[in-house]
Amino acid sequence: MTPDDVTADWLSNVLGGPVDAFTTQRIGDGHIGMNLRVGLTSSDPSVPESVVLKMPSPDPTSQSTAAMLRHYEREVKFYLEIADTVDIGVPYCHHGEWTPDTNDFVLVLEDMSPAVAGDQVAGCTLDDARAAVLQLAALHGPRWDDPTLSDVDWLSRHEGQTSVDQLKVMWQMFFPGFAATYRGQLTDEMFGLAEAFGDHIGTWAGERSGPMAVTHGDYRLDNMLFGPPVEAGSPLPRITVVDWQTPGHGPPIVDLSYFVGAGLLPEDRREHERSLVALYAEGLATYG
């Protein structure tokens, strides 16, 4: 699917109502996909004013990476098969399809504007973090230790030698860039710990145990859209979580630790991390 394939007839078909005219605008900075905001003109009030389309990147290398990691397949299948079984806020999916033979895909999603994407470099407020961990509980809680998830073969799992080998390759690819960027900001002890981890990936992956749930796999501020509070007077923003290219079946604590460790500035994390974990646990408790 490319922008040239988007026509009024195609949009009318997938949205279930006549589209008389449309406009397109490239949005976001996706590395392995392309995002378009499509403005719609229709005589049918059931047709939204705009939608967001996700489709493959025009870059062949990005397409190959996405195919190897099953990103396109997993994102489409998350929206079609998993999204309705969990409570986390996601854009409504009007249409989704993925073609196994070509790895082509398209998603037609609710346009969440004027919600604003988070910034993992700038960090977030405490209220933003509270809303994010509650949304995480809404992802994990509904299918906590659900045995039927073992039958969902397209969910990412870091188990088995093949998965461990993939993790090792990714480590070798990305660690040099990490070291070049952050070495000067880390103590010798911290950097040594990070450097040594590469030799112990297999042990780390093999020893993880405990409850399992649906996981996001990349739960960071850049993948969250922040909007007005759901309830009037609430300090907590409405959060919509996007970029479901890495959904998995694994330890839910990984999503939580990744967000708390990377979402807040260090001084804020040190002060509030325990209360955020406690709030997450409270959110989980509502699911039994």
Q: Predicted regions span which residues?
A:
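Juxta-kinase regulatory segment immediately upstream of eukaryotic protein kinase catalytic domains
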Residues: 1-24
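Short amphipathic beta-strand and strand-loop transition segments with alternating hydrophobic
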Residues: 21-27, 94-96, 196, 202-203
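Active-site acidic catalytic loop and adjacent metal/ATP-binding pocket
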Residues: 27-42, 52, 198-252
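Conserved ATP-binding subdomain of kinase catalytic cores across diverse folds
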Residues: 28, 32-41, 45-167, 252-253, ...
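Active-site activation/catalytic loop segments of kinase-like enzymes and analogous catalytic loops
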Residues: 77, 246-288
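Generic, well-ordered alpha-helical scaffold segments in large soluble proteins
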Residues: 82, 139-142, 200, 218, ...
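ATP-dependent phospho-/nucleotidyl transfer catalytic cores
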Residues: 115-216, 226-237
